[in-house]
Structures are given as structure tokens and as C-alpha cells.
């Protein structure tokens, strides 16, 4: 950051940093052997398609915006509680949500963002 840093650059760096944090978590989850077939975007962040495009490009995967994305976190918590309380198989309760729109990754941005992620990780993840 310097005197030339403007509001747009600052906001972009904030969003990029949050996205890198999500990518770092995604990598950790992937290393556990859990197969991540589909990735869904829910909540307030799902309203900004530019951010989702950036995140998809960092993850190098397309991302799906769900129907009723504002309610999906509460809906997911309720389904997990129902699953635990009723001792059911997860296949009976945890079905994929309805997809409103798929945001495709930008293949031209992925290599650039991977380099920037490596720099971010070098500074922030110890």
C-alpha cells in the first residue's frame, strides 16, 4: 500500500485476501480425501457475481449460486440437526440445493491468481 492506493484497489485487495483464505481452507479440506463434487455459493456473497467469478478463478472451479441463497445456511443447519436427531442416512436428508446460476471460472486469470495466492500464503500463513 502506498500513496497511489485508491479505494478500488483497497476493496479489491480485501476481497482477494478473503478469497485466498477460502482457497487455503479449500485446499486443506481437499487434502483430507473428501471428494468435493460441487461447490455452492450461499449468503450475501452470492449476490456479487464479480466476486464469485474471482473466487471460481482462484479455486479453478465453476461455482453454483443456489436458489434462496440467503436462507441456505439456516436450511443446512436445520437439515444437519434433523439428520442427527432422527439417526437417518445422510443421503436421505442432505440433497444438493437447487441451482439458480453457475458462474464459470476465468481460465485466463487462474495462473495469475495462483501466483498471487503463493505470495499471499508466504506472507500470511505460517
Regions found by a protein language model. Give the residues of each.
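Glycine/Thr-rich phosphate-binding loops that ligate phosphate moieties of nucleotide
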Residues: 1-126
